[in-house]
Amino acid sequence: VGMMGALTMTAGYRRERLLSMFDPWSDPLNTGWQAIQAGVAMSNGGLWGMGLGASRAKWGFLPFAQTDFIFAIVAEELGFVAALLVILVYLVIGLFGLNTALRAPDRLGQLLAAGITTWIMIQAYVNIGAVLGVLPITGVPLPLVSYGGSSMVLTLTAYGVLLNVARQTP
């Protein structure tokens, strides 16, 4: 933990990124821009959203809107209710993977199911946490939602392996 703190604080850009997580308004035009715009986008959505395709943030205000900040766009276009549904879907995926890992017939299946589920859940947690401003912005895509070919292919392949392990369970 101490080494991670030292590495974070020695590189200037890492320090600025971490400090802007706590107070994005200290540098609103540079390191805090993405966090502020993500918050604005989510607040614009309200309870039911602005309508599918009606987001304003994705047209230049929020950088990497289709990849790193897709959760903010979902919240803006479809609202708080849809954002909660996305979180609920990830919880269901996590419970399915945990159940599969616990019921897998052999050790390999258990480890595969646990590893794939942990990977998908941590990636979702880090992305949503960064968009909400409770974690530093890291550039981790939101599994199964973010735009990007390699991430989508790897996630779908891993989920296919998880489904195969689930199929083998009694």
Question: Where on the chain are the PLM-derived regions?
Answer:
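Generic alpha-helical transmembrane segments of integral inner-membrane proteins
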Residues: V1-G5, L84-V92, L156, G160
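Hydrophobic, glycine- and aromatic-enriched re-entrant/interface helices and adjoining loop segments
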Residues: V1-L85, P105-G109
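Alpha-helical transmembrane segments of multi-pass membrane proteins
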Residues: M4-L7, I116-V126, G160
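Hydrophobic/aromatic residues in alpha-helical transmembrane segments
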Residues: R14, Y90-G97, T117, A130, ...
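Transmembrane helix-bundle signature of multi-pass membrane transporters/permeases
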Residues: F61, I73-E76, I116-I120, G148-S151
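Hydrophobic transmembrane alpha-helices and their immediate junctions
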Residues: F80-A124
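A juxtamembrane structural motif centered on a specific transmembrane helix
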Residues: Y125-P170
